[in-house]
Amino acid sequence: MNLIFATHNSHKTDEIRKIVGDLCTVLNLHDIGCAEEIPETSDSLQGNALQKAQYVNDKYGLDCFADDTGLEIDALEGKPGVYSARYAGEHCSFQDNINKVLSEMEGIENRRAAFTTVIALLYDGEKYFFEGRIDGEITKKQSGTEGFGYDPIFKPNGYNQTFAALGEDEKNRISHRAIAMQKLLTFLKEKKIL
């Protein structure tokens, strides 16, 4: 079975493919010939995920899923949140976002943070949502080379390393995206879709 993942992000696609394993084939927007950038204009993770999935469903007539992820930092009143991917500006890099967070967190003792992923699934005319969350903290400096996004500065609770230093196998076992994806896979198995 093919699962259509409404994303152009190759890092996310690779991560999801590793989480899913051989249960099914995950195809992204590039794989289905969609080159358009899908706007994310909602003020919620759920809204952005649904917006992306709905776009693909409307334009291509395909059942699909999409996700949106936010890093919420207590000391920054929940920022960057829904704007995590473009926190340092519309066309910023992962490093630009990291630099902005580290700059804003300079001298702050409360470093509590959480990653949340919401997956929206459009299947057979119905909408379903799956959420994953992991609590942790923002480190004072970058550590590790694996992963992407804020992984070099996010240390999950119960671990002494950042996501980027844990290695992809461990991250893909415990991450917010893995938690949400496991919920989606469980749903698909229960519905006998997988």
What annotation goes with each model-predicted range?
Residues 2-4, 11-194:
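Anionic-ligand binding patches
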